[in-house]
Amino acid sequence: MCISRIAFGKVFKKSDSPFKDNRFSEKILGPDFAFLLKAHGEAMPYFKSLKREIISVATFDGLKLDGLFVACPQTSSDTVILVHGYNSSPEGDFPVITRYYLENGFNVLCTNNRGGKNGDGDDITFGIFERLDTALWVDEIAKRHPDGNIVLHGVSLGGATVCMMSELTLKNVCAVISDCAYTSVRDEFDYTTKFVAGFTPRRSLEKMYRIFEKTHGLSVDEFTPLKAVANAKYPILFIHGKEDRFIPVSMAYELFDACPAKKELYIVEGAGHAASCVRNPAEYASRTLEFIKGCKR
């Protein structure tokens, strides 16, 4: 149980990013990791120069989460909510994406998720509670722009989160963009442990899941992206890098096949994990914007 508890603390709690070790990053995220860091680094001065407004929400369990709202240079009532990945932040995932949305008529709200680098709280629930947190921001934006469209765009854990939100009834949401989402926590950990260690330590994982259930009062299997998209209420664009080593591209096909709503699948040739937006940025922008255009209310 001791090993499982340590693993629980490493995986489901806020911690320093494991991707600081470049050798580990190259193995699990692929050679695109350095390319991704470079692209975001080049876009960072622009991102930091943006005038932001903090929009805070209070979660059901007492956390205060801050979102960074950036108004479109041209007056707009349409907003994209960007949901970052595991142990990350808006600065870590969205310097590139933010710009093309702002330049194409959208306000942008970047969330700081629970357990993320800048987020309140220490617990990471892989979309289970994050979906409810993000729904609070949806409500805030809908109050500000009651006639506007809201797009949910998430990357990695954020992609899984917006998939899990697709079955919720949400004000003004017209489309979901899911970039490199996993099908479930269980599927992802089975895959990742085998890829990294060469085998899947099922007994240890099961003990870790039991600790999660005891801590949070629900199972990791109760809410999953795969289950949620099967009841999707909104159009979904599924994006995935073909060379993703962290979350396999096969999961994008599973999510796509399970979704009964309007949908598209965009597989980015040569892209590693979370790197689709920088591997072919012009095509990524055009595909997402065209999809959203066809979904506006």
Regions found by a protein language model. Name each.
Residues Y86-Y100, N113:
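The serine-hydrolase catalytic nucleophile loop
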Residues Y100-D120:
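Conserved alpha/beta-hydrolase
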Residues M1-A58:
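An N-terminal hydrophobic leader/cap segment in hydrolases
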Residues A271-A282:
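Catalytic histidine-centered segment of alpha/beta-hydrolase-like enzymes
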Residues Y234, P248-D257:
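Short alpha-helix in the alpha/beta-hydrolase fold that links the catalytic acid
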Residues N231-K233, F238-H240, D244:
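Short beta-strand/loop motif that positions the catalytic acidic residue
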Residues M164-L218, I267:
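Hydrolase active-site cap/lid region
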Residues P90, R114-H145, N149:
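Catalytic nucleophile-loop/oxyanion-hole region of alpha/beta-hydrolase
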